[in-house]
Each structure stands twice: as structure tokens, then as C-alpha cells.
Amino acid sequence: GPESKELFEKVLQNPTELGISLKNDIIFFSDAIENEIGLLLKIDDQQKFETFLSILSSEKGKDTNIKRENDIFISEINANAICTFDDNKALFLFALQYNTEITELKKDATALMNQNKEKSLLSNNGFSKFSQSNKDVNIWMSMAAIPSTTLKLYSSFLPTDLKISSIYSTTHIDFQRGKIIIESGSYSDDTKTKKALDNLISVVGKTSNSFLKQIPENSWLVWSVNLNGEKLYNILMENSKFAAEIGNVSKEINLQQLIGSIDGDL
């Protein structure tokens, strides 16, 4: 409609017309249990933000209906999205399942707005370590959220002591003049998993760039890794299930010799 077009033009000129602060963190999160996705924003101008919600609701074919419950304002965007906010922050919560009741979504969003530190992600030791190293974009993932069937599949190829569900995966992206720096890693609070991860990482060494002369100058992607095949084979054989499968395959192919022959850049 004309109102949304007018707001869109204003936002193009000045993004703060949404009433949202772009100087503070913008946070996306996913709840694996409730199957919901959240967006957390800092409010800079509550009146402008309410105007934005009004236009957003009208575009979705709904009347603006902002209700106040104690110190929290609640607005239903559509059947699968809700916004709760106060004079400081706004939380958009989206249901990934279409059969989710809006009352349940409202209940979850209100609980998140009211929860204390002890019930939040800040109480997770694994996240605390991650939050100490912030860049422009920061991504944190708990492997415990991976479906159990997928975890079992991955586990069948990894050392027995490596508990995937205890691993946290991280990515940091930093935008600098003339370049983008991406750092990724993983860590665990579980002692046995830590040791297994260190052992697994020892399989990989620094690349020597031995074969770069053979790569054409117009290449758009180069991926290289330095592997110790003998170490890799020994680690894989620590998993009894994998060792049994290797035994069956080895009747046709000498995998120990094949994998063990890898020693250097690929």
C-alpha cells in the first residue's frame, strides 16, 4: 500500500526510520526444541517502531493490535509470527511449523522477554567462551541440536570417545578494508571429546602450496588440505563399527595402504 511504499522510501534514505538501532547487535537464534526462530533488535524510537508494526500488519492483511501486558507490548504479525517489545528491545518470534498455535507462540515470546540470566544462553559455559571473541558477524552452534539419527550416522565414522553432542561450532566474520576474514573452529567442554578432537586435528598439517604452479590463473576457487594418511587411518580404526566395515571392504581393496599413502597436500 501507499503507507508501506512511503516508509520503504524513508528507510532507504534513513534506516533508523524503522525505530531500530543499527549501532547495536542484531541477533538471530533458533530453538531446536520449540522449533522456532527469533530475531532480537534494539529499539531506538518506540513510536517509529510501532508505526512500522502497524504497516507490517496491514500488509499481512491484519489490523494493528498492540496489547500491553505488564511492561511488555505484544503484536500478532500473522498466524505464525509475533512481536513482543518494550521501550528497549524487540523480539520477533516465528514458528517453523504451520500448526503452531499463536497462543503458544505468544507464551514462548513473553517467557523469553521475562527470563533471567540463569535461564538464558548466558548460563551456557560453551557460549560464554564464544562470546569473548566478537567480530562483525558471529555464528555459534551447539551440535546437540542435530537430530539423533544424524548424530548416529556421523558417530559411526568418528572415534568412540568423540561425543558430537558436546561440540560447539563457531564462525567469526570480520569486514576489513579490502578484505573479509573468516575464522571457524570447534571446541568441547567434555574432557574425552577434547582429547579426541585434538587427536583428530593432528591429522591435518599446514599446506606447503606445492602444486599451485599447476592451477590456472583464472581459477575462482582453490581448496587444499594437508593430510597425514597413516594417522587418519589409525584414528578411523579406533571406531569398532568402522573397523568392521573396513574389514569387509579390505577384502577387495587395501584401504590401509590406500589411505596411508596420503602424506601431504591434496
What are these regions (language model features)?
Residues 1-6:
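N-terminal mature-domain "stem" immediately C-terminal to a signal peptide or N-terminal signal-anchor/transmembrane
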Residues 26-27, 168-172, 208-212, 255-257, ...:
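Generic recognition of flexible, low-complexity loop/linker segments
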Residues 10, 20, 51-55, 199, ...:
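Charged/polar, solvent-exposed surface patches and flexible loops
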Residues 9-125, 261-266:
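Single conserved position on a long alpha-helix in the C-terminal lobe of the eukaryotic protein kinase
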Residues 20, 85-87, 94-234:
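Leucine-rich, highly hydrophobic segment in Treponema pallidum outer-membrane-associated proteins
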Residues 53-57, 63, 153, 196-200, ...:
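General "foldedness" signal
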Residues 217-266:
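Long, K/E/R/D-enriched contiguous segments that form extended
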Residues 15-18, 60, 207, 211, ...:
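Short secondary-structure junctions and interdomain/linker hinges
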